Structure formats: structure tokens, C-alpha cells
Amino acid sequence: MKHHSLIFLTGFSGSGKSTIGPLLANSLGFEFIDLDREIELTAGKSINRIFAEDGEAAFRSLELRTLEKIGQQERMVVSLGGGVLENDRCFELIRSHGTLIYLKSSPEILTLRLQHKTDRPLLKGPDGRKLTREEIQQRIAELLKKREPRYLKADLVLFTDSKKIGASVEELTRKIERHIRRASKNNTNEK
């Protein structure tokens, strides 16, 4: 059953999910949860260690099980990992249980936000070296091309390139409240 008070934030790494998420949750009076942190707590080890020791299939299985638990909750803002929507089962679970919001940023802005980060595997080459700014932007553009068709199936989209964080949270809060009112009205009319 779809809970309109279960909000899922999606978007590329650096789009603002971890920054906007807790502020949005506070604004709505909801709890905030980061899916990757929940997976780490369940597994008792980091995402990097899960991939290294158990493989991607084990990680994806944990991801789905964690989402199934979260799907039973209400009044929660959930920050999703950048690739979770590529899994069809996860995508359907998210779409059927809550409101999906895409925090959209351009490859150029994402590059500016991410180029000095050292903890992101996507910013390293196959040999482990740090990618150049141009290589980072190219990798982001390639991954966005692959992921964006799913991102764009979100219920709501918020562009995060040039907005201040507070303005983004205010705009998103208004969009969510309107969306929930419309959805509630539609559900009432269907009965």
C-alpha cells in the first residue's frame, strides 16, 4: 500500500540527498533515514566491505530486504543510493510504497561538488588513481545517461544546481504537501 508520508529521495551522488534529506524530514516532522547506513548497520560492515567480501549480489539482496522493512514505515524521508533504482524490484517497491523525488543536478555541478571527495569509488579509475576533473565529468554524464530514465519516473523533480539549501527544502516541502493533498483527494474520489 502506498504511504504518501514515506518520501524517497533519489539522484546522483552529490545531488543533495544527504544534505536536503534531514532538513526536509525536520520540516515535515518526519524521521530521516539513509538507506546505505541502514544496510551497513544490518550487515555490521561498510558498503565497500560488503562489495569486497560478499559481492554485489549480496549487497543488492540486503538493499531489497532493507527497503522492504522501510516500506512498512510512515512519516519518513529516505535517502536512496544512486544506483538503487536500477534494480527493478527495488524500483517497484519504492514506487508502490511512497513518493519518489528526484534531486536533479547537471554533470557540471555534480563534478564541482564531487571532484575533491576521496571516498567515492566512482571518482577512481580502474587502477585506483583519482580521476581528473574531465574524467569525473565524463563518468558522471555516462552514468546519468544510464540512470536518468528511472530518475525521471519520480513523482516530483527538484533542480538543485543553483538553489540555496534552505530554498530547496522550502520548495520541496511545498511540492510534497501539494502532491499529498492531490493524491489524498484522488484516493477519496476513487472510493
UniProtKB/Swiss-Prot annotation:
The keyword Metal-binding applies. It is found in: Cytoplasm. GO terms for biological process: amino acid biosynthetic process; aromatic amino acid family biosynthetic process; chorismate biosynthetic process. SUPFAM superfamilies: P-loop containing nucleoside triphosphate hydrolases. Mg(2+) binds at residue 18. Pfam families: SKI. Its cofactor is Mg(2+). InterPro entries: P-loop_NTPase, Shikimate/glucono_kinase, Shikimate_kinase/TSH1, Shikimate_kinase_CS. Pathway: Metabolic intermediate biosynthesis; chorismate biosynthesis; chorismate from D-erythrose 4-phosphate and phosphoenolpyruvate: step 5/7. Binds 1 Mg(2+) ion per subunit. HAMAP family: Shikimate_kinase (MF_00109). This is Shikimate kinase. It comes from Chlorobaculum tepidum (strain ATCC 49652 / DSM 12025 / NBRC 103806 / TLS).
